[in-house]
Amino acid sequence: MRKDYLNSNKDSLSAPEKEIERALRPHVFADFTGQEKIVANLKIFVQAAKERKEPLDHVLLHGPPGLGKTTLAHIIANELGANIRITSGPVLDKPGDLAGLLTNLGPYDVLFIDEIHRLNPIVEEYLYTAMEDFKIDIMLDSGPSARSVQLNLNPFTLIGATTRSGLLTSPLRARFGINTRLAYYDVTLLTQIVKRSSQILNVPIEESAAYELARRSRGTPRIANTLLRRTRDFAQITGSGTITQQIAQMALKALDVDEDGLDEMDNRILSTIIEKFHGGPVGISTIATACSEESETIEEVYEPFLIQEGYLHRTPRGREATPKAYKHLKLAPPQRAGTLFE
């Protein structure tokens, strides 16, 4: 079962958790930590669009969950001084849903579509002319009396976010003038984020404790903030309210987050590949079945970090465990078979 701090679905958070997440979210570029090159470029693009009194070019933000795509979308809207309308790909089931959103946008407003790779193909086609020409064709009636009516739209900026940019169609991808990929964070930046969030939450934290949480956060700010909130609970109930390194280590152990930031499901994936399938290669659907998890969840939430950190290899024949995975699980790697001439 997926841990809540790895949950890529922001909508699954409770109302109080959503309020806390909003409070922790930066609202301007100056408060956003990390992704320096991306932020520097976006500052220039936003300022130039404002000076020309033009809509900002459409923006595609892609990368693993929890790195700040939604936060950047809100910051862009704030910096533009524009309203933002928020939706997601699966919600836009019919062209009429999209038309309703687009026709209600004011001049230079921002439309943010999360999980844009999951757009209905029919809806996506309607989006093309809206993005290029700020027009949309809608069908009135049906059958022999059906007719198409073209509606003019206010100039707007579409911001799309996706964890799986490879699933975007070429025509849709080509219509984004600004295409950026967010990268995992290093421990130094995550430590800064943990300390900033602790100040907002008004919870004292030791430097060593902030570092401890940061280094086990899988390079992901959202996970760092969630671990901070859970550790705050332990500090409140079992300590003096201050998050010490000892409290942090105790909380992380209780949450099954090991020294390398891997949780119970990470270790289950690795041990499944090694113990049930002799280290691989093995297909993702087979791994998902063996681990009682969805293939999409493994691909989007767990696999990117495991590959990034060198625990997994992705090959044409499937996933393979690396020597680092064997070492992490304290297992002996298999001996390579000798060649004919050895």
Swiss-Prot record:
Residues 1-185 are annotated as: Large ATPase domain (RuvB-L). DNA binds at residues 314, 319. One of its GO terms (biological process) is DNA recombination. One of its GO terms (cellular component) is cytoplasm. ATP binds at residues 24-25, 66, 69-71, 132-134, 175, 185, 222. It catalyses: ATP + H2O = ADP + phosphate + H(+). It is found in: Cytoplasm. InterPro entries: AAA+_ATPase (IPR003593), AAA_lid_4 (IPR041445), DNA_helicase_Holl-junc_RuvB (IPR004605), P-loop_NTPase (IPR027417), RuvB-like_N (IPR008824), RuvB_C (IPR008823), WH-like_DNA-bd_sf (IPR036388), WH_DNA-bd_sf (IPR036390). SUPFAM superfamilies: P-loop containing nucleoside triphosphate hydrolases, Winged helix' DNA-binding domain. Mg(2+) binds at residue 70. Its main location: cytoplasm. Keywords: ATP-binding, Cytoplasm, DNA damage, DNA recombination, DNA repair, DNA-binding, Hydrolase, Nucleotide-binding. Residues 259-342 are annotated as: Head domain (RuvB-H). GO terms for molecular function: ATP binding; ATP hydrolysis activity; four-way junction DNA binding; four-way junction helicase activity. SMART domains: AAA. It is an enzyme of class 3 (hydrolase). NCBIfam families: PRK00080.1, ruvB. Homohexamer. Forms an RuvA(8)-RuvB(12)-Holliday junction (HJ) complex. HJ DNA is sandwiched between 2 RuvA tetramers; dsDNA enters through RuvA and exits via RuvB. An RuvB hexamer assembles on each DNA strand where it exits the tetramer. Each RuvB hexamer is contacted by two RuvA subunits (via domain III) on 2 adjacent RuvB subunits; this complex drives branch migration. In the full resolvosome a probable DNA-RuvA(4)-RuvB(12)-RuvC(2) complex forms which resolves the HJ. Belongs to the RuvB family. This is Holliday junction branch migration complex subunit RuvB. It comes from Amoebophilus asiaticus (strain 5a2). The lineage of its organism: Bacteria, Pseudomonadati, Bacteroidota, Cytophagia, Cytophagales.
